Amino acid sequence: MSVKAAPGLDRAAVPPVWEVEFVAVGTDLKEAVLWSPAAAEAASRATVLVDGDRHTLLPAPGAEVPVGEPGEYLLDPNPAVTRAGLVAELARATGTWQIDDRIAFLAAAAPVATPFARTLRVLDSGPWREKDLGARIRALDVGSVDIRRRGLAGDVDVLRKRLARALAGGGRRATLVMTRARDRPWALICVDA
């Protein structure tokens, strides 16, 4: 038996012998499915549907995922992976490492193709200092940004307004990642890989 639920389902409300499957269509987390003990295969799973193909990530035992400095590439795991608690499994499957032990971003030295994460090429990586950010953005000819924030407080709309002058006239679109790296506030300016 299965029960469809909202993707924001409180995991604590799920009986311990039931499986929770988080389903995303592309990068949009759409639903959670609870599987009864008779149908359950694992405690959780992430399913990502891309162009008609179904990709599933299951829990798997393995070595602890290393934590290190950000690399040349950054993986932003699919929301189905993060909700299912399978970031470590994704890291082991892709040969990547975490940039902070409490944050879901993963790092790589080379591009990684996986349906379970968006891979970004890192153009600039350094400690988070808002006062220096405008100069870093201008130096890269960035004119518009998608801001991703994990592990740091702050209002992305306020930051976007503060960066408006730095973004004026730039020709490149980028993703600004505000996060933590090895427990330090960190900023990465990235483009799609």
For each feature predicted by the language model, list its residue ranges.
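SAM-dependent transferase fold signal centered on methyltransferase-like domains
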Residues: 2-193
